[in-house]
Amino acid sequence: MRNLSTEFKEQQNSGNRNYLKYADFTFTDGSTLSITDKDLWSNGFNFEDAVSQSGSFDIGAAIVNKLTLQINNFSGKYTDYIWDGARVVCYIGLELSTGIEKIRICTMTVTDAPYQSTAIISLTCEDSMRLFDRDYSESKLTYPATRLQIIQDACEVCGVTLQSTRFDNDDFVIQNRPNDNSITFRQVIAWVAQMGCQWAKSDEYGRLCLGWYERE
């Protein structure tokens, strides 16, 4: 859950959607770039944060969420950047009485950046859930194994930090290893989450979380 100030929540509840947008890039060569609203086209910042497929209510979803950016390249100053593989951390902000409050919303990797020398650079970015799209045959975990051990193993093999170091019924033991001839780590994660009536998602820092909807 993201930490928001009381005033930020009040502004949202009153209908204020005048969000300021920020994206900080780290390129594969180690160089960095920060862009803000003035560098983006209108409606050029779209972020998915789903834990269920569109039009359905899923238990055990493990969705790769996406971010699309459309950068204003009218001056040509961004033409020579190598966007593919860049890490991007995005924030939104609101003008409050105490100044601008920025909230981190995602950590993504640019996965599609067709070369464009035009006025618009369109980037498609995906979160760390995509890293689990590897054959489960790579896992050397011995079964029986607990739900927590299966999730820990998936994170270790795929190079993703686990945020949910404990979760409901994480000690439930699964006796038999799934047939790994044609399944991925992400499918196994979804299966483990479904067994606990939970979802799995990548948080704003790119860590794997297992949880469920908050009840107020």
Range-by-range predicted roles:
Residues 1-144, 153, 157, 177-197, ...:
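Assembly/oligomerization scaffold segments
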Residues 131-135, 162-167:
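Short acidic/His/Gly/Ser-rich catalytic and metal-binding motifs that mark active-site loops
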Residues 166-169, 203-206:
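Acidic carboxylate-rich catalytic motifs and surrounding loops in phosphoryl-/glycosyl-chemistry enzymes
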Residues 168-179:
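Surface-exposed aromatic
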Residues 205-215:
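Acidic/histidine-enriched alpha-helical segments
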